[in-house]
Amino acid sequence: MPIDTQALFDEKDYTGTYPYVADGVIGPYTPANRDHPAYSAPAPGVRYTSSAYKVSNLRPYLGYYYACQNYMILASEPAVLRMDNIREEMFFPTIQDLYEEGKGWVITPASKILTMNLLEGQPRLIDETLKIVEWNVRFDILPEVQVYRKDTNQVYPITDFDTRGLIRDGAIHGTLRTQFTNEWRPVQFIPENSLS
């Protein structure tokens, strides 16, 4: 059944920074340093309710994706996330490899590494029947973020670990796409360098 486009869209302009929410706290947060990775990083909580097909409900859905990306860079613990495709979607898979192998981790002064900016006032409905929507976004990266490698005992800028070629001008640019239904559907990030 096609989506009711009048119900989906509203008159608001959602362009701008989306608030970062990660309040799933299991203990006092301890930032990483050369001696250890971050402890008790705040995890994102699900804020999505699928009761109605409205942009106001879509935004928290995409916000959860954003928070999961940030959490994976900060803590690399996918088990606490309700996002099945996070491993395929990770912006920095080589950092995940360092975490898993115990060879390194991210060092940052803050628990928020990414800032998501919505670049359009409203999403675009690209398939009315399948309810597929897209929204152009930019993820700004905190410039102070570094990656510590135990094997070299050195820190490196996070940009050195951009094996997917996503970063341009200190940010990751692209499009978030999802099928917006009353069930939890994966969000897919489409990098600007793969858009035609």
Tell where the protein language model's regions lie, with residue ranges.
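Long, compositionally biased
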Residues: 112-123
